[in-house]
Swiss-Prot record:
Residue numbers spanned by region Legume-lectin like: 26-260
Cytoplasmic topological domain residue ranges: 316-669
Disruption phenotype: Increased susceptibility to the oomycetes Phytophthora brassicae and Phytophthora capsici and to the bacteria Pseudomonas syringae, characterized by stronger necrotic symptoms and higher bacterial proliferation.
Organism: Arabidopsis thaliana (Mouse-ear cress)
Molecular function terms from GO: ATP binding; carbohydrate binding; protein serine kinase activity; protein serine/threonine kinase activity
Designated name of the protein: L-type lectin-domain containing receptor kinase IV.4
Annotated Gene Ontology cellular component terms: plasma membrane
Catalytic activity, reaction form: L-seryl-[protein] + ATP = O-phospho-L-seryl-[protein] + ADP + H(+); L-threonyl-[protein] + ATP = O-phospho-L-threonyl-[protein] + ADP + H(+)
Residues that span the membrane, as ranges: 295-315
Amino acid sequence: MFFIKLFTIFFLSFFWQSLKSSSQIIDFTYNGFRPPPTDISILGIATITPNGLLKLTNTTMQSTGHAFYTKPIRFKDSPNGTVSSFSTTFVFAIHSQIPIAHGMAFVIAPNPRLPFGSPLQYLGLFNVTNNGNVRNHVFAVELDTIMNIEFNDTNNNHVGIDINSLNSVKSSPAGYWDENDQFHNLTLISSKRMQVWVDFDGPTHLIDVTMAPFGEVKPRKPLVSIVRDLSSVLLQDMFVGFSSATGNIVSEIFVLGWSFGVNGEAQPLALSKLPRLPVWDLKPTRVYRFYKNWVPLISLLLIPFLLIIFLVRFIMKRRRKFAEEVEDWETEFGKNRLRFKDLYYATKGFKDKNILGSGGFGSVYKGIMPKTKKEIAVKRVSNESRQGLKEFVAEIVSIGQMSHRNLVPLVGYCRRRDELLLVYDYMPNGSLDKYLYNSPEVTLDWKQRFKVINGVASALFYLHEEWEQVVIHRDVKASNVLLDAELNGRLGDFGLAQLCDHGSDPQTTRVVGTWGYLAPDHIRTGRATTTTDVFAFGVLLLEVACGRRPIEINNQSGERVVLVDWVFRFWMEANILDAKDPNLGSEYDQKEVEMVLKLGLLCSHSDPLARPTMRQVLQYLRGDAMLPDLSPLDLRGSGIMLGTHNGSNESGMFTSGSSVAYSLLSSGR
């Protein structure tokens, strides 16, 4: 029975001591480090001098030095508990021949080795990868002597509280407050001894960092103070110590004495027992004098020189950016040539957000001319080969001299390196095609459509017969018909246009244009004439009246449906009005719609000799002439047989000369 009572008393005593151990006071004090203590581990370039100085760094460049108390310190009663109060104080000194060197830090870390700590500005604590990582679980007080912009440092002589990062949660220039609340600066790199106190109050989470010159009592007012719960930062068991680093300029950092305590204030250091620092020749050295006297002077001279170099490079780069190549033959087009610089600023650097659309030739951008505030559309035409560029520019400029109310005005051109930029007036209502297909949000009534048709017909008649030369557009289609503010139809995009004298035809044998608008004779011979424009205009008439694309895919059979053949079948069945656009509703002129559908078939006849001229087309549209009987139409319809012509691609555009959809010059694309 006696042994049972004795065992019970022993067990309860042991259990009480174990409960109490977590809140016991843990402390240690080093008034110097001689003889070298066995419970201090030193790593890297850190050493302990014969007279008992803990020397964290030496003259080795780009290295780290660590010194840690070897035993883990219990900061929390449980892994998820709150952090106990702790405090520490130490005396340090930093010596360097010039006032530029890296500093040091008091550290609480889960590992005394800090294996991933980098030198230089990282002070041996972190590196470029893990700086700021919450999994670091590192608390530190840095005494930093270099201003690093990347860490938002206060200056090049500051004290900061760091949590998992060298971006201090709070910092202050190094110094102390006297009894009269007057602040006094302290220079960290001064070869002088200074004392630092770090205190954390567990219940209030208050962190205070205080410093003072060696031998002074601890100031009443802390230098840096912040409330921060460290429960998520510190683990249950942690290691305490110091970390430092060197860069390309070295320094010597010493810790003369160190005291630390948990659940109690750190014991005061016996300042009289601390080891002495080495005796340095504090007279200005040659290196220091050079740094002090010549570096500022060189900087004053070098900064303007570097600014001049920067400005020269900036100007040269800017000139290259806006450089234009002007050849002798372009002098005659001087008034039509625009500066690339103006177009660059007009389109805000040809940014993607200003793209109105893209096509076979390139992209089209909306812009506002800087001086006149005129809205423009700029088409960037890629020109891989210089062959024929002179002739192309000459034709474009000549076309730009045309003036007709139903043509999109060409403002001018710009040639730069391997690309050509064509500048047109901007049409606010976009291209015609966006009002026709796929149940558009906004549709045109029949009066508006008939007005557009008449406008385009008038423009083509002007091109074919009224101007000083014959202009074959070669790319008449709905997307190249632009609508101005009054919804007048304007024919644009003369990128494929060709000029010839009246009474003659162009000699080209190159098939260009957009699939679905190409006349069979043009595909067969490669020759473009005014009748090929009439064919494309006939397809356009059917598009406007039917609200369908020139070529569509049947959703059920997957076959291609040619609009001209589709309308022709309705005509053969004597119900051609059934081909009209359902979006027209019931408010339309039946005779006009029927006339436009039949005129579209006539214009898109497979035989070019059976097609009317644009003069005749205008007469039919204006009611000045009666539309001829369509009964002689060849039952083969349009003559376009999809899949029988080589050279087309899946997108329906001829690879030999695809056009840029001019609707891209509008806001609707």
